[in-house]
């Protein structure tokens, strides 16, 4: 049934809970991680208060992955970034209110990521007057996309990257924060009600605020300039680690050139206080200017040298081996690879300009995974010899080679339990020794999954209707089209029409094994449904049963019959 169609919709990242029967990884204690362990001090949980020329600013760090900032105004305050969960927002605001308990007049999202937006609903619950929600005009589009068609895969990969399944003692940090807390409470995203394209000047609670579009880590990124406070909030365009020019959880191309331009634009304001959304503030004009220069120069170097070598005809894997940061900036603490890496960035820049094909003819239409595995086995002298090579690789701590060999044996489905155990050993070895938290957590979580099964992304809180009001019906129908199972296709040109009480209308036509979505009701409806948007949303995520909804009249079938409608819903899985 469609009950589990959108089972991951209400949560971007799943709970960091594990069953008592889960197999432990026995992650070893290794040397070489001293800098990463020391980096955890960057996120010591606290609220720091600053007296700026324009008034007090309070900075909460260490509560989940992202910082939250409160600026005091006249009879009211503003929040910049609302934390990664309602749970953390509640904890943060308890401390903020001890500093100043005036009502929150506005919440500003610096961009769409959940660690900056998912705590917002807490502020609607604690006061009668709804705070104004301010963001770039594209922010809601990107939130809807992540909570829509990309949700299942982003959920899985984010869980791996942030290590939310790992025992607390094995999670050192996540590079830009101590941990991700989004799973501890329902998602609290609230749609913006004031948006802008390039810049916006406001005065809220006596605070002069200038907002500027600053594409970088996201296309909708903004920075906040408070001229009277001499303070700038750069969002995620700078933090104390090498930038995530590409994130391994998966992302559309990040405009690296735009990121450089945004950092240059920030420099023009010559701020005295820089309050990033991750890691600690930077205080002092020179200190801020130096940090911004190092950051933008590093990004430009990686960008320009990738382009230079691309134009010489080198393939991505060749370019990766040639680009290292210049000695003059390589040892800056702002460029330690605790989040992004130079290698991943090079590949992303190449892909952003030229796409997935690196130029090597052998990679254009390569052998299938199974074909290559068979030929590797033949080359080794058979499956037993290939397995012997894998055993030797693990024995000799040649773990990257072990992972690649295990790929072939898994494709061959050969002695899968032993191969799995060897692969787990290789993943733990590589992950536990990595000083990059993204890689470390991804590898260790992948090992956990091999031992305990793939993440069950249906483990979510289905009880909250609040988020459904923030998710558009358009988003849900987009998801429907991507969940249509062509193996269940039977009726060509079969159309189901939906008329919602909001006066919105939707058609789904099944033809040529695709589900075609349109907004205008046709005269060719095989089934016609009258209902409320919220009721249909609840059905899609499993909060309501379509059989019960038909029986109690919250779904009315005015053309066709319930059997056909239920059969139709069952095609989307």
Predicted regions and their residues:
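Feature captures hydrophobic
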Residues: 392, 398-404, 408-411, 420, ...
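Conserved beta-strand hairpin/beta-sheet module of binuclear metal-dependent hydrolase folds
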Residues: 44-100, 223-236
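Active-site metal-binding motif and surrounding structural segment of the metallo-beta-lactamase
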Residues: 43, 49, 53, 75-76, ...
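C-terminal motif of bacterial Sec signal peptides marking the signal peptidase cleavage site
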Residues: 13-16
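Sec-dependent signal peptide recognition
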Residues: 2-8
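Metallo-beta-lactamase
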Residues: 77-78, 84-86, 142-213, 258-270, ...
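Accessory terminal helices/loops
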Residues: 21-39, 151-158, 164-177, 181-182, ...
